[in-house]
UniProtKB/Swiss-Prot annotation:
Domain comment quoted from the record: Contains 4 SPKK motifs which may interact with the minor groove of A/T-rich DNA sites. Phosphorylation of this motif may regulate DNA binding. This motif is reiterated in both termini of histone H1 and in the C-terminus of plant H2A, but its presence in the N-terminus seems to be unique to sea urchin histones H2B.
Chain positions of motif SPKK motif 4: 19-22
Family to which the UniProt record says this protein belongs: Belongs to the histone H2B family.
GO MF annotations in UniProt: DNA binding
Biased amino acid composition, Basic residues: 9-30
Record key words, sorted: Chromosome, DNA-binding, Nucleosome core, Nucleus, Phosphoprotein, Ubl conjugation
PTM annotation: Monoubiquitination gives a specific tag for epigenetic transcriptional activation and is also prerequisite for histone H3 'Lys-4' and 'Lys-79' methylation.
Function: Core component of nucleosome. Nucleosomes wrap and compact DNA into chromatin, limiting DNA accessibility to the cellular machineries which require DNA as a template. Histones thereby play a central role in transcription regulation, DNA repair, DNA replication and chromosomal stability. DNA accessibility is regulated via a complex set of post-translational modifications of histones, also called histone code, and nucleosome remodeling.
Modified residues (Phosphoserine): S14, S19
Short motif SPKK motif 1, span: 4-7
Complexes and interactors: The nucleosome is a histone octamer containing two molecules each of H2A, H2B, H3 and H4 assembled in one H3-H4 heterotetramer and two H2A-H2B heterodimers. The octamer wraps approximately 147 bp of DNA.
Name of the protein described by the UniProt record: Histone H2B.2, sperm
Motif position, SPKK motif 3: 14-17
Amino acid sequence: MPKSPSKSSPRKGSPRKASPKRGGKGAKRA
């Protein structure tokens, strides 16, 4: 987790499977 602190933020609110499902990974990075 220390590698990407940004992932820890969204992970707190929603699970990891919900991130890629909604495309949050691309939207958050964009």
